[in-house]
C-alpha cells in the first residue's frame, strides 16, 4: 500500500479538495515543491499557478490557486489559497482576455497602476499555465 498524507485545499469561500494523496506539487515563492508522505514540516507562500495532486488511485487532479500558503505537518498538507478553482472550472477565453487587457494597460501607460496591471498579467499567465498543464495531462 502506498504511503499517503491527508490534503486539504481551501479558499476563503469553500473547501475545494479533501482526501488522501500520494503527492502534491505546487509553485512556492522559493520554487516548485513536491510534498509526499514523510516530508519535513514546512510553511511557504504560494505563487499563482497550478497545484497538482496525485490521488491514491494514481489519478492526477489539477487546481489553480491565485496565491496563498502551503503548510506541511506530519500527516496533513494544507493549501490555504486566496482563490482556488478546479482546473476544469476555469475559462480559458476569459484568462486570455484578461492577459491581453493587462498587456495593453502596461503598454498604454495612461492612468497606469503598474503594480495592479502586473499582478493581473501574472495571474492570467498562471491561469493559462494551469490550463496548458491540463491539456498536457489529457494528451498522455
Curated annotation (Swiss-Prot):
SUPFAM superfamilies (alphabetical): Epsilon subunit of F1F0-ATP synthase C-terminal domain, Epsilon subunit of F1F0-ATP synthase N-terminal domain
CDD domains, per the entry: F1-ATPase_delta
Compartments where located: Cell inner membrane
Gene Ontology terms for molecular function: ATP binding; proton-transporting ATP synthase activity, rotational mechanism
Chief localisation class: membrane
Gene behind the chain: atpC
Organism: Saccharophagus degradans (strain 2-40 / ATCC 43961 / DSM 17024)
Family: Belongs to the ATPase epsilon chain family.
Bilayer disposition of the protein: Peripheral membrane protein
InterPro entries membership: ATP_F1_dsu/esu_C_sf (IPR036794), ATP_synth_F1_dsu/esu (IPR001469), ATP_synth_F1_dsu/esu_N (IPR020546), ATP_synth_F1_esu_C (IPR020547), ATPsynth_dsu/esu_N (IPR036771)
Phylogenetic classification of the source organism: Bacteria, Pseudomonadati, Pseudomonadota, Gammaproteobacteria, Cellvibrionales
One Pfam assignment: ATP-synt_DE_N
Summary of subunit composition and partner proteins: F-type ATPases have 2 components, CF(1) - the catalytic core - and CF(0) - the membrane proton channel. CF(1) has five subunits: alpha(3), beta(3), gamma(1), delta(1), epsilon(1). CF(0) has three main subunits: a, b and c.
Keywords: ATP synthesis, Cell inner membrane, Cell membrane, CF(1), Hydrogen ion transport, Ion transport, Membrane, Transport
Source organism, top-level taxon: Bacteria
Name this protein carries in UniProt: ATP synthase epsilon chain
Amino acid at each position: 500500500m502506498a504511503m499517503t498524507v491527508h490534503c486539504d485545499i481551501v479558499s476563503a469561500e469553500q473547501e475545494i479538495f479533501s482526501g488522501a494523496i500520494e503527492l502534491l506539487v505546487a509553485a512556492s515563492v522559493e520554487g516548485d515543491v513536491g510534498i509526499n508522505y514523510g516530508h519535513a514540516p514546512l510553511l511557504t507562500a504560494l505563487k499563482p499557478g497550478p497545484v497538482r495532486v496525485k490521488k491514491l488511485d494514481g489519478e492526477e487532479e489539477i487546481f489553480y490557486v491565485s496565491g496563498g500558503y502551503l503548510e506541511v505537518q506530519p500527516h496533513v498538507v494544507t493549501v490555504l489559497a486566496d482563490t482556488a478553482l478546479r482546473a476544469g472550472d476555469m475559462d480559458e477565453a476569459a484568462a486570455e482576455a484578461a492577459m491581453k487587457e493587462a498587456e495593453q494597460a502596461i503598454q498604454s501607460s495612461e492612468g497606469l497602476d503598474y503594480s495592479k496591471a502586473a499582478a493581473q498579467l501574472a495571474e492570467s499567465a498562471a491561469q493559462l499555465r494551469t490550463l496548458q498543464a491540463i491539456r498536457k495531462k489529457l494528451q498522455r
